Amino acid sequence: REGGFNYDTFLIECECPRFASGDGKGLIKSTIRGKDLFILIDVGNYSIQYKMFDTMNCMSPDDHFQDLKRIIQAASGKAHRINVIMPILYGGRQHRRNYRESLDCACALQELETMGVSNIITFDAHDPRVHNAIPLMGFDNVMPSYQVLKAMFSTIENLKTTQDEFMVISPDEGALNRNMYYASV
């Protein structure tokens, strides 16, 4: 361990403490000057809680995204490059406007680009065309199809995948291409 940096794990200690009012701040406890940062954030992790007005609250995707921005602000101007790994893309289901609706995913990606993020890595984006909101920034959409199939075959006993006993159903239009792939293998 040197300068708060753990060379065994490459993890840097950071936190987003909350004040009694619910406001938060981002705090990086190690030097990051000249480093490539990979910030991992799970916006769907509802098990994290914080106290506000003596009441415990579960963190929402909006809370997680605010904490991500706080950590990016704490790192800005010091890190060589900032990469965000977001397995579930924040606002990913709000990628297309119908009537008077917000485009949360596109706005969030543009906000991260403005803050100096170099690259976003996500898994199975609801609609990968959301990358069009940030054409000059890196956007890697990793498709975990093989891993899903491998896990399914190794954990479900007596899984029968014959045409008569197995059906792949798409929950919505965004998952149609992925499920067509699953049905074809």
What are these model-predicted stretches?
Residues 1-185:
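PRPP-associated nucleotide enzymes
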